[in-house]
Amino acid sequence: MFSSSVHGNGAQYLSITSGLLVEDAQGHRYVTCALHGFLSDGIVFHPDPIRGRPIGKVVQSFPNADVGLVRLEPGIRYTNEFFESKEGRVSGVTPRRFATSEMGDIIEMDNPFNGSCAGITVGRNYVLENDLYHRHHWQIFERGIKAEDRSCGSPNLDGNGEVAAIFRFADSENPKIGFALRGEDVEKLGLKLVDNHVF
């Protein structure tokens, strides 16, 4: 779980799911995050800024994809393992690559905020934001509760345990409908998955 700094003088902050351990073309390693979850200072806390401590900083961003790259503090180990809810089938899965997925593919997402939920990719389309079109999967979650707001950044696994997409946001009127950044588009950012790493 990642959390932002406190907003203003109050005690408000945003928590999101920690993402995937990735490596860029230069061999630098980062953990992905949903970029919109962090203030301009880029400081990342775990579990939150009230009870926790700073564990890293957003050092690179791909704003058109809502993906940020977090460099964790030295000595912190990060492993690409998934949250283990009893209902899910992804417990203990370590994904090896980003997958190319198609309409009709079953996906599963499991995180501390909504537990396990599964659904189907119903389309590959574009979302218009800030006069730019972004490719997304449209997903309908059919098992489990709705995808909660703080699920942003959660990996969506396909039936082979590979990363089909990174969850981005749910429809405000129907939270069972979600949108996710396609795995192949994450690869086009020059990123590949890594099993584990000590920063």
Could you say what each language-model-derived stretch is?
Residues 2-136, 157-160, 168:
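Serine endopeptidase catalytic core focused on the charge-relay Asp
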Residues 131-150, 166:
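Extracellular trypsin-like serine protease catalytic domains
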Residues 58, 109, 144-145, 174:
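Short, flexible coil/linker segments at or flanking structured domains
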Residues 88, 125-127, 139, 174, ...:
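Generic alpha-helical propensity signal that fires on short helical segments
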Residues 146-148, 156-199:
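C-terminal subregion of chymotrypsin/trypsin-like serine protease catalytic domains
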